[in-house]
């Protein structure tokens, strides 16, 4: 139905807001709904929520609000934090996702419409073409990715020095990682 994120934003004339991001609803959730509604085909979905206070609370809310998804939270169940998950990848010889290697705290789409001011200024530096295209899309759609107490913040008007620096997710292998994956050879 939709070719990509850009197609969703243009056709829906909506980026994000109180009801979430248009691309999340139409490119991720719609696919899940179609699969989970097929009788006998849905054993649950694995969610990558990591073991930290915010994500545990998010998982609890998600399970309460979406029981039909039969959510599975293996990282939380095994008490694996995001830094430990990255450490496990490293120990297994699996390349850490590019966005983490570039210093981002999440591995979302490049130019995720849910990112904050600091995130967008980092995107401006790291991916100037993507930043410019999203700024163009905002004008085409008539909506913005960013808002503050004064209203909309257009990317093409965003002060390059505004916003907090993105905090990189550092790779780690704590005692949990070491115990769980003692047999994985270090690389």
Predicted regions: what they are:
Residues 1-187:
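Nucleotide-activated chemistry modules centered on ATP-dependent adenylation/adenylyltransferase
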């Amino acid at each position: 139905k939709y070719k990509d994120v850009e197609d969703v934003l243009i056709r829906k004339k909506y980026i994000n807001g109180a009801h979430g991001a248009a691309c999340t609803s139409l490119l991720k959730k719609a696919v899940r709904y179609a699969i989970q509604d097929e009788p006998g085909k849905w054993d649950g979905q694995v969610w990558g929520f990591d073991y930290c206070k915010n994500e545990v609370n998010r998982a609890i809310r998600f399970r309460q609000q979406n029981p039909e998804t039969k959510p599975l939270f293996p990282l939380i169940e095994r008490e694996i934090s995001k830094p430990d998950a990255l450490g496990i990848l490293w120990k297994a010889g699996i390349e850490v996702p590019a966005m983490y290697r570039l210093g981002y705290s999440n591995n979302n789409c490049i130019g995720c419409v849910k990112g904050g001011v600091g995130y967008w200024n980092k995107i401006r530096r790291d991916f100037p073409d993507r930043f410019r295209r999203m700024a163009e899309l905002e004008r085409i759609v008539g909506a913005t990715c960013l808002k503050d107490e004064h209203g909309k913040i257009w990317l093409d008007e965003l002060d390059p020095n505004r916003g907090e620096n993105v905090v990189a997710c550092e790779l780690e292998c704590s005692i949990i990682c070491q115990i769980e994956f003692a047999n994985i050879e270090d690389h």
